[in-house]
């Protein structure tokens, strides 16, 4: 399973949204994610991948694709920093 698919599954589970509704070009509002759902998703991502996602980062996400790109970037940054400190 790709990282994008893992994240879509996680969003679906945490926000109780049908996977079929989760298109990367859909806005978070169109998907039906409210602030509580977003916090649940962020906590789940932080727990699963060991990354930190700040409020300022989230303010820049308008679509599911934006959110997935942000999470992927955070995961990649964490992996690079761990590799650099090894």
Q: How should these model regions be labeled?
A:
Residues 34:
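Conserved ATP-binding motifs of the histidine kinase catalytic
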Residues 37:
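Two-component histidine kinase catalytic core, primarily the HATPase_c
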Residues 2-31, 41-42, 48-86:
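Phosphopantetheine-dependent thiolation modules in NRPS/PKS and related acyl-activating systems
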């Amino acid at each position: 399973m790709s990282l994008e698919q893992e994240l879509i599954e996680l969003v679906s589970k945490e926000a109780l949204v049908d996977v079929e509704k989760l298109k990367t070009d859909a806005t978070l509002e169109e998907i039906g994610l409210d602030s509580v759902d977003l916090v649940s998703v962020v906590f789940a991502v932080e727990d699963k991948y060991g990354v930190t996602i700040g409020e300022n980062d989230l303010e820049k996400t308008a679509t599911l694709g934006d959110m997935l790109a942000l999470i992927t970037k955070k995961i990649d940054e964490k992996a690079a920093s761990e590799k650099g400190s090894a």
